Amino acid sequence: MDRNKSFDPNLFKRVDINLLKRNDQLIGKPTTNSIEIIKRLFQNKWAILFFLLIVVIVLLAIIVPLTSPFSAVTPVSTNALAQNLPPRYLWHKPGDILVHKITARSIAEISQASGVLVGTLPSANSNPLATNVQYDIAPFQLQELRNYFPLLGTNGLGIDIWTLLWASVAKSLWIAVVVAIIAMVFGTIYGAVAGSFVGHMADNIMSRIIEIIDIVPSILWIIVLGATFRFGGVKQFDDSVVIFTLIFVFWTWPATTTRIYILKNKDTEYIQAAKTLGAHQIRIIFVHMLPVVFGRLAVVFVSLIPAVIGYEASLVFLGLKPATDIGLGALLNQVTSSDNVALILSSIVSFAVLTVAARTFANALNDAIDPRVVKR
């Protein structure tokens, strides 16, 4: 370097070193892997949105059935006029909402006596052979319904749809989560053991068992197992029968997924290093192998929830569960024979939102956990 070379001082500016960001001077506790995963997860705005949706759905499923003054299994009133009521809000007066009815003359005469009939009934002498009449009523003029404000109205049985909806979501979520947890625990352990002993007799036998179960259609397994339980004296599927049959059907999914990802990672450097250091096979499986596939297993777990709800619905359609039972499956079954817009939209939208939110959040969680994604 030429020491005699001159520099223009105007090209430089003094900077206080204390104002610089000095990473080498930062002192603090090292962050754990779980904290880093949470940070990466909530940097995804879609993950935050759908996580909040799931939280809202779960909270409503817990709070609404507990706080609602109405039951999810009994009508709001014994009066036939309480069936298929439209929504009513605080600004509606009792006489503001009219309902068009085509029903038996006897019921119409009851409504006339109740003081809720709008207009007059056709004379019996005008058509004495007529069994049905058309008329308009103001159902909220009934004394027992004057202070009733249904957010979504009532169904054909007179049950409050808002309460029924969230009680059904709670029941289906409870069954789905129980099935998913047990199927995941058993399937993950099964798949990890099979994958770590690949090439041995144990893996061959365990893999054949999975293939035998998977080759038979799932719905057939459900029917056969359900029929077996019914031979034991159970006339229809109760919750324990549903949970058992669905666990039997779905445990092979996480087992297969775990085995595949164990096979992909069993020859990696850190696994070979653990073997060289003398780590026990159980420690290698549960400490070194399984954490690598947690992201994919999270996707499988939340994907099981809408799948379980769908299969639960199929039990209602097959007549293996009573159509009057509480659950999203039974609620969706009611949609097929109803023209109640509130019932149709609420059941379909709730199922769709829950499914999309769960799958999207699972994919975001997989991206946050998977080390191959993090390194990109």
From Swiss-Prot:
GO CC aspect terms: plasma membrane
Bilayer topology annotation: Multi-pass membrane protein
What PROSITE patterns does the record point to?
A: ABC_TM1
Which segments cross the bilayer? Answer: 46-66, 149-169, 173-193, 209-229, 242-262, 297-317, 341-361
Alphabetical GO biological process terms: peptide transport; protein transport
- ABC transmembrane type-1 domain boundaries: 169-366
Subcellular location per the Swiss-Prot or TrEMBL entry: Cell membrane
Q: What is its main location?
A: membrane
Keywords from the named record: Cell membrane, Membrane, Peptide transport, Protein transport, Transmembrane, Transmembrane helix, Transport
Annotated S-S bridges: none
In UniProt terms, what function does this protein have?
A: Part of the ABC transporter complex OppABCDF involved in the uptake of oligopeptides. Probably responsible for the translocation of the substrate across the membrane.
Family as reported in the entry's similarity comment: Belongs to the binding-protein-dependent transport system permease family. OppBC subfamily.
Quaternary structure (record):
The complex is composed of two ATP-binding proteins (OppD and OppF), two transmembrane proteins (OppB and OppC) and a solute-binding protein (OppA).
| Protein name listed in UniProt | Oligopeptide transport system permease protein OppC
Source organism of this protein record: Mycoplasma genitalium (strain ATCC 33530 / DSM 19775 / NCTC 10195 / G37)
